[in-house]
Amino acid sequence: AEWLDFSANINPFGVPETVQHAVQRAVGALVHYPDPAQQKLRQALAEFHGRLPAEIVCGNGGADVIFRIAHALKPQHALLPVPAFSEYEAALHEAGCHVTHWNMPFPYQITPALLDELRQGNYDFLVLCNPNNPTGTGIPPALLEQLLHLAAEKHVFVLLDECFCDMAETEPDIVSMIPRLSEFPHVLVLKSLTKLYALAGLRLGYGICSDQKVTAKIAHTGQPWSVNLLAEAAGIAALSAEDYRKMSLEFLQNERWRLFDELGKLGFRMWKPSANYVFFQAEQCPDLDRQLLPYGILLRHCDTYDGLDATYYRAAVRLPEENQYLLHCLRCILGEEGLLWQQNH
């Protein structure tokens, strides 16, 4: 039987048809090596973002770019706000970097207190994720700007992960820094095509930095041919799938709020969603993910994230009927108990 996977944040509409066709056409060229410099892909990305091809470095998924940045720049002491995606720390440790955690104050948001830590500590690398995974919380634009200016002053390089930023473009408190990267040459924005275009199995991520010496250094770190021929064809086609993009963003915006409202009615503590997932706490039900397995549902429990325990969960936004089934199963599990819990809170 097929699992309904709410644990992976992938666009529920699946791979765009134009991308599928592009990949099928590219199969005939598999006898050739891919372009090690990904010139066509970087040109397409540059046009899409209004940047220069030399400001872009591509990799085998966002995680590949993270590891290559760590190895290319060899930072000594990184500041990492947590909870956060585990690969930042794994990459930094592997490159011999000391990592200091900064615990985001509840409700797990970046606050001006991070400015003080950055000012006082002896750091040369800062990781920011906007909106954050798994919480979905954004960094207020004015605060983000202050952090980037302070980092410049302190000679701190910033990895700004915007992998979920596309999906938050309707949220006024989450703003992409890509148009302003020329002001911040010490910042690399991390992006991925796997989430919005459902290309998780192909792996395609990239970084954008206005300091071309940085992108060149990253490009020459790690293995050559880091983007295969099929992934490059898929990426180029995805960038021109404008109707698919519009439809997806509109759907995700409406559906995430519906899921937010319905989960809230079940008595869970909810976080405002800004991407294609919903983060919540089920204090009354710490083994919710295990209880959903007999229903064929995979849910992401967040106790593997630093600072979170087994009562925190992240659910991807799937198709309406699939989200409806998740809600139905949760009502079955909570039963009377869930209703009683709701009345008492």
Where are these regions (language model features)?
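Conserved PLP-binding catalytic core of the aspartate aminotransferase-like
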Residues: 253, 263-295
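PLP-dependent aminotransferase class I/II
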Residues: 14-16, 37, 186-271
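N-terminal "arm"/small-domain region of PLP-dependent enzymes with the aminotransferase-like
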Residues: 1-32, 121-122, 345
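PLP-dependent enzyme catalytic core of the Aspartate aminotransferase-like
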Residues: 142, 294-295, 304-345
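Short loop-beta-helix segment that forms the pyridoxal 5′-phosphate
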Residues: 34, 46-68, 81
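PLP-dependent aminotransferase-like
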Residues: 71-128
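Short, conserved charged micro-motifs
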Residues: 17, 284-291, 322-325
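Active-site pre-lysine segment of PLP-dependent enzymes
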Residues: 109-122, 134-158, 162-196
